[in-house]
């Protein structure tokens, strides 16, 4: 009995389940999904229309979740890695202390955030490969984490 307990204690981390991946979409040249990179796993829905194509996409990002903190002074820490290269962390300010450009700036804890954000990266050329982007949403003077998501994009072809 003791060897079994010792074995299961020492090697339990090896046999744990990987974090669940949330599929977003597939396009002709890419697949996109995310998983949580924090332990809070607060339900967040992410949808992209149309699905991302690496040749250049202009579309809308739909984000739906219930705020677990007041959304004030919101910024995103972006950690991006491309193949084996990691880019310097980028900090994007989304909401300032007294408002911002987005309707969810100033939302209170428990309120539903249901927003659509336009995006475009036409003219940018991506090489085939796997891209990772960790998005940490930080809010308030105490810099509390709202959520952390780890996005993965796999670019299949070299059609760009």
UniProtKB/Swiss-Prot annotation:
Disulfide bonds join 25-51, 37-148, 95-105. Heterogeneous homomer formed from homodimers; disulfide-linked. Belongs to the lipopolysaccharide (LPS) receptor, a multi-protein complex containing at least CD14, LY96 and TLR4. Binds to the extracellular domains of TLR2 and TLR4. Ligand binding induces interaction with TLR4 and oligomerization of the complex. This is Lymphocyte antigen 96. Keywords: Disulfide bond, Glycoprotein, Immunity, Inflammatory response, Innate immunity, Secreted, Signal. One of its GO terms (cellular component) is lipopolysaccharide receptor complex. N-glycosylated. The keyword Glycoprotein applies. PANTHER family: LYMPHOCYTE ANTIGEN 96 (PTHR15218:SF1), MD-1, MD-2 - RELATED (PTHR15218). Residues 1-16 form the signal peptide. The gene is LY96. GO terms for molecular function: lipopolysaccharide binding; lipopolysaccharide immune receptor activity; Toll-like receptor 4 binding. Glycans are attached at residues 26, 114, 150. The keyword Membrane does not apply. It comes from Bos taurus (Bovine). It comes from the Eukaryota. Residues 119-123 are annotated as: Interaction with lipopolysaccharide.
